[in-house]
């Protein structure tokens, strides 16, 4: 079943790239969402729907996939965000085909149980993102593309060395995750392996100062917001630290933990500070994403079960509300021709539905209780406090700042006087709005249900690091 979930969007994406109608892509995105909703609702715990087949058996490489509670949650949020984008983003069929292809590669990344296969999906998921930027981006897309590729190469080569070292230096017979965990690295080897992983994953989180690719990536991408929403979903560094880097090299992590905690807190505060000064929605959301990923990383780096669980939940939730805000920004651009904050005012008068959706998405971003951002932020800060009270305080300041920049942007755009004449939500946009709000409410009101598969993983993670029961 997990293989079907990975292949379904890839097949529909390939059909769209061959020139079939865009409506087929909406159907494919909808079917993918329904399938992943079913997989999440029926997930029995543990690693379900496991699939394993030899790829290069002589080299110890296997097509190995499985769905645990963590990957099941990400399968759901990724498929939901792509479906929402397919509903409302006015893009041509081939663009949507690239989006579906990227969805399938992201699902493969989150389900991979073989380290080398994970590396392949980790890198392959970049290809559709690069093509969307190159083919459909703005005037400065070439520079943004070069920056993106440069940072990717800086992380990719050390990561490949770490992947090979994790097996060869440990004596594991295969690249399968369970075999690697059963053959722990020696302390010196663990440091170098972790360093290779950490560089790549810090770029893809991203953490300050390895975030320079992020603002131009969003600013120059297609104004529909679909590529930006997918870029939000590709911020997989926190997941990769939790799934691979830290469990495979805990001694290496222990040597770098203090620095990583500091960089995570700094990323949270720096991102919030720059977002407050942003003049357009894409820049605001890019730096807000940096800030939220810093908070999520802080939770995982704390090594506590609360922090890890909160950081991962925040990562999943942010894909929905940040992705939703990028798509909303695309709707604003279609109506006004600009993304500049304050350029259009008083939108709530002529577009109350659009304004209500924006308010709920922004409130989820700032962590209002009852919406999806709150449970992850609360648990993350709780876990971070146990590891470092003063760094948790810095992260808390970023949460306060998020309310300032988000609500200020909302006020300038929707609430101040200035008859805008912008039309309200219509047609499929109402479906986008209702599904988004429903997801934000359910994840905020019933976090225990959505995070039911995270708790045992977070406990095992903390126990590995000496912080669990």
Swiss-Prot record:
Keywords annotated in UniProt: Cell inner membrane, Cell membrane, Membrane, NAD, Quinone, Translocase, Transmembrane, Transmembrane helix
UniProt-recorded Gene Ontology molecular function terms: NADH dehydrogenase (ubiquinone) activity; ubiquinone binding
One annotated Gene Ontology cellular component of this protein: plasma membrane
InterPro entries found in the cross-reference section: NADH_Q_OxRdtase_chainM/4, NADH_UbQ_OxRdtase, ND/Mrp_TM
Protein name: NADH-quinone oxidoreductase subunit 13
GO biological process, one term: ATP synthesis coupled electron transport
Family: Belongs to the complex I subunit 4 family.
Membrane topology type: Multi-pass membrane protein
Function: NDH-1 shuttles electrons from NADH, via FMN and iron-sulfur (Fe-S) centers, to quinones in the respiratory chain. The immediate electron acceptor for the enzyme in this species is menaquinone. Couples the redox reaction to proton translocation (for every two electrons transferred, four hydrogen ions are translocated across the cytoplasmic membrane), and thus conserves the redox energy in a proton gradient required for the synthesis of ATP.
UniProt keyword rRNA processing, yes or no: no
Keyword check for NAD: yes
E.C. number: 7.1.1.-
Chain segments annotated as transmembrane: 1-21, 23-43, 47-67, 69-89, 91-111, 115-135, 144-164, 190-210, 258-278, 284-304, 308-328, 354-374, 390-410, 430-450
